[in-house]
């Protein structure tokens, strides 16, 4: 009885990840969801994506000949304040733990970019074309960066160590690999029910993590945080040994096709063709299904999609099907699918 609180809620039968051919942009679509769960999950995932994923960022910079951030450097067009702002935008991926050191040294004339930075083995610059400063003829600059890992946003004053040497300028650190997240809730249908939710998440990252992985990490964080509120153990229901021995196939094949919440046309076509159980259905080939009266390509695609969500497909061979006592077996294994 207790388990029905969560077991009978509808869950998405598919989650689509669309990358748009880019590592930094992704769209995630999940449907169907119970009414209201699109907003609940979308808002929770968005907040965790923006605040709680770990990443790497510059925490401090030391520039030769510069004592503080309100200085200017001869032959450098930008003042130090602008240089620090540009440094904050460097996107970094770091596999290990910090802090690590990076150095850039360049002579003018020319532009100093993130790609000019000399990195250590497990540190990668993800936006090498990003401009840090511009040098005039005869100008020279050397900068040493401190890189660390963390989460969220850390202001510069918290990156200032008490024993920091003179000239070490702390930098605001945006550790989060996720830059933007938006979500949209739309109505969708499942079978004959029209008021389920469809959740669409649009994610932009700095490239250190893909949108698909970012959503997975955020969901895992939520799962871990919510588990503390579960104050009971779920009873484990084991099938008797003699029942297990009777079956040479997945018990889900004993489920009746009229429980699949198919469209009326698809359900009627299956009934016309005397297809009662999923086990009957999956042994049919696509060609056989299309020969069924009033059964078209749209119905075929609908059935293929439902079967795929269960790990099944048309044209499967099932040994020992149908079993002689199929109705009794269907009742006995009803709780297992």
Swiss-Prot record:
Offer a single GO CC term for the protein.
Answer: cytoplasm
**InterPro entries, from UniProt?**
DNA-dir_RNA_pol_insert (IPR011262), DNA-dir_RNA_pol_RpoA/D/Rpb3 (IPR011263), DNA-dir_RpoA (IPR011773), RBP11-like (IPR036603), RNAP_asu_C (IPR011260), RNApol_insert_sf (IPR036643)
Give the SMART domains listed for this entry.
RPOLD
**Which UniProt keywords are given for this protein, alphabetically ordered?**
DNA-directed RNA polymerase, Nucleotidyltransferase, Transcription, Transferase
> Could you tell me which Pfam families the record lists for this protein?
RNA_pol_A_bac (PF01000), RNA_pol_A_CTD (PF03118), RNA_pol_L (PF01193)
> Residues annotated as region Alpha N-terminal domain (alpha-NTD)?
1-233
Q: Which GO terms describe its molecular function?
A: DNA binding; DNA-directed RNA polymerase activity; protein dimerization activity
Please list where the region (Alpha C-terminal domain (alpha-CTD)) is annotated.
249-337
- Name the EC number(s): 2.7.7.6
One GO term (biological process): DNA-templated transcription
* Catalysed reaction, written as an equation: RNA(n) + a ribonucleoside 5'-triphosphate = RNA(n+1) + diphosphate
Task: Read off the Gene3D superfamilies from this record.
Answer: 5' to 3' exonuclease, C-terminal subdomain (1.10.150.20), DNA-directed RNA polymerase, insert domain (2.170.120.12), RNA polymerase, RBP11-like subunit (3.30.1360.10)
Q: Name the job this protein performs.
A: DNA-dependent RNA polymerase catalyzes the transcription of DNA into RNA using the four ribonucleoside triphosphates as substrates.
Subunit relationships: Homodimer. The RNAP catalytic core consists of 2 alpha, 1 beta, 1 beta' and 1 omega subunit. When a sigma factor is associated with the core the holoenzyme is formed, which can initiate transcription.
Q: Which family does the UniProt entry place this protein in?
A: Belongs to the RNA polymerase alpha chain family.
NCBIfam families according to UniProt: PRK05182.1-2, PRK05182.2-5, rpoA
Give the domain note: The N-terminal domain is essential for RNAP assembly and basal transcription, whereas the C-terminal domain is involved in interaction with transcriptional regulators and with upstream promoter elements.
Entry protein name? DNA-directed RNA polymerase subunit alpha
Q: Which organism is it from?
A: Brucella canis (strain ATCC 23365 / NCTC 10854 / RM-666)
